[in-house]
């Protein structure tokens, strides 16, 4: 049941990754062993992409929690997976401070501090893929990209990805950093049956061969369990192919573009098993067209961030 692979830059990774953010939800603090087991099960099944971030934590004073958890899971793994094939990605650029004060800081010094902290939490000498989390509206976007390039030039990171970008921001990043050969290798944006506004970004990534990692591919934790009732066609097609609505969503996303690599979250090993199963499902052209024709709610998981900050 090993999932097929797709490319992120010069690397091949499983076509379905594991979004690790839910493992650091406050409700998971008393289920640490289960969190570790969830990552271990993903590795057992051939998942070679783990996505984390410095701000994924149960509280503001535990920043780095998710990175440390992922590092522990990798360090304690004794299963059959070849860990030399594993890609652990993290992010920087969003701040989370005293009393849950959220902000953005992509100044060069702040990005360096964040990357250095992530190196320590992950227990590595270099970050294989570092993703710029969100545009800092106080700074020119090109300047933020220069900061990322400096991290790469200085050997803190190997590859650069973007997150939560619009088409204009992506094009600026490409101008500064270059394309997937030696510059921008991935884009991580929201994309799901619920939210599809970034189709133009996906199209650009498909054109250039830049990996597109849709976050919250099932519409977020609050909607994932009932995605089949909110978007009935995913349940209908799922019945036709012997899959759950959630598995059908992942199969549909994979069929949208050869650069698509969903990163669904999980807090139980069984959920990872379902995601990996979805990577092997095949949709007919007619089924794919029905799913694509379904109407999105078009509401972001984080509506306060829309419309996006103006490009400066």
State what each model feature region is.
Residues 1-83:
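N-terminal binding-site loop/beta-alpha segment at the start of enzyme catalytic domains
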Residues 10-12, 44, 73-87, 119-123, ...:
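Acidic (Asp/Glu)-rich catalytic clusters
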Residues 11-16, 46-48, 80-86, 124-128, ...:
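Short, well-ordered coil/turn segments that N-cap beta-strands
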Residues 21-33, 98-109, 133-139:
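Active-site mouth loops of central-metabolism enzymes
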Residues 24-26, 56-60, 95-101, 220-224, ...:
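A short acidic, helix-capping loop that chelates divalent metal ions and anchors anionic groups
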Residues 30-43, 106-122, 170-171:
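Short, acidic/polar
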Residues 119-138:
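Active-site groove signature of glycoside hydrolases
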Residues 135-312:
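Beta/alpha (TIM)-barrel catalytic core signal, keyed to glycine-rich beta->alpha loops juxtaposed to Asp/Glu
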């Amino acid at each position: 049941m090993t999932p097929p692979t797709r490319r992120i830059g010069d690397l091949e990774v499983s076509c379905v990754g594991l979004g690790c953010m839910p493992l650091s939800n406050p409700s998971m603090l008393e289920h640490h062993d289960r969190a570790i087991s969830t990552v271990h099960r993903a590795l057992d099944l051939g998942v070679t992409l783990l996505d984390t971030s410095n701000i994924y934590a149960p509280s503001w004073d535990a920043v780095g929690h998710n990175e440390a958890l992922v590092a522990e899971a990798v360090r304690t793994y004794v299963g059959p997976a070849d860990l030399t094939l594993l890609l652990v990605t993290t992010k920087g650029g969003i701040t989370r401070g005293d009393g849950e004060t959220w902000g953005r800081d992509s100044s060069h010094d702040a990005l360096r501090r964040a990357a250095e902290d992530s190196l320590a939490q992950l227990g590595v000498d270099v970050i294989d893929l570092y993703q710029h989390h969100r545009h800092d509206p106080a700074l020119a976007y090109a300047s933020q990209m220069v900061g990322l390039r400096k991290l790469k030039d200085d050997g803190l990171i190997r590859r650069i990805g973007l997150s939560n970008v619009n088409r204009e921001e992506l094009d600026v990043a490409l101008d500064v950093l270059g394309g997937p050969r030696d510059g921008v290798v991935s884009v991580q944006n929201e994309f799901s049956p619920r939210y599809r506004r970034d189709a133009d970004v996906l199209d650009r990534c498909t054109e250039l061969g830049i990996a597109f990692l849709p976050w919250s591919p099932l519409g977020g934790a609050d909607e994932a369990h009932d995605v089949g009732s909110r978007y009935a066609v995913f349940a209908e097609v799922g019945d036709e192919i012997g899959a759950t609505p959630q598995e059908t969503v992942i199969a549909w996303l994979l069929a949208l573009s050869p650069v698509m690599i969903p990163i669904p979250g999980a807090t139980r090993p069984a959920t990872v098993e379902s995601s990996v199963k979805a990577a092997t499902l095949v949709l007919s052209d007619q089924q794919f067209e029905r799913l694509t024709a379904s109407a999105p709610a078009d509401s972001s998981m984080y509506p306060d961030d829309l419309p996006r900050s103006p490009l400066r």
